[in-house]
């Protein structure tokens, strides 16, 4: 739960928390996001969670650390340190380390019960307008009416 001293999210407003986590802390240049992994994330019958879900969690935390509606990911360097299994609660902690114009460097660590499972450096860019341009709009609500 966000406390009153924290910021409101300005980015990735339509994202589904089931797949990339729920923000638990959001401050200028910092974000923490929690993800409870579930069976539909499993890569095999033993419950190994596909690394893409952990990466998605880390990416979302990096975007929230920047917290601009026009932030995009340019590149990343990722290290998967330990396996994640169905039922694990993984928390991503993101901190903006540097800013050079529109380029932001964000360090992210994902932990399970305080044990690191992922580390990454994300190079993000804040663009002057949405990456799809000013005239592109899509109905992402799923409402066919």
What do these predicted regions represent?
Residues 1-3, 70, 84-86, 97-145:
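HotDog/MaoC-like acyl-thioester-processing domains
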Residues 1-40, 135-145:
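Non-catalytic linker/capping segments at the edges of enzyme domains
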Residues 18, 75, 103-105:
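Short coil/loop residues immediately preceding or within conserved phosphate-binding loops
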Residues 31-33, 76, 92, 106-108, ...:
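Hydrophobic residues positioned within well-ordered beta-strands of beta-sheet architectures
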Residues 35-37, 80, 126:
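Hydrophobic residues in beta-strands and at strand termini
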Residues 38-56:
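A conserved, well-ordered hydrophobic junction motif at loop->secondary-structure transitions
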Residues 60-91:
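Hydrophobic beta-strand-centered segment that forms part of the acyl-chain substrate-binding groove
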């Amino acid at each position: 739960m966000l406390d009153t001293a924290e910021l409101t999210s300005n980015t990735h407003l339509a994202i589904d928390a089931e797949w990339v986590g729920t923000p638990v802390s959001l401050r200028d240049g910092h974000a923490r996001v929690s993800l409870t992994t579930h069976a539909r994330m499993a890569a095999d019958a033993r419950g190994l969670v596909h690394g893409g879900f952990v990466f998605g969690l880390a990416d979302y935390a990096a975007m929230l650390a920047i917290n601009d509606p026009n932030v995009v990911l340019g590149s990343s360097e990722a290290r998967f340190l330990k396996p994640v299994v169905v039922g694990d609660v993984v928390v991503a902690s993101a901190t903006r380390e540097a800013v050079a114009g529109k380029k932001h460097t964000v360090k992210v660590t994902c932990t399970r019960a305080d044990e690191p499972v992922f580390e990454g450096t994300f190079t993000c860019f804040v663009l002057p307008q949405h990456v799809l341009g000013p005239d592109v709009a899509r109905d992402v609500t799923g409402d066919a009416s």
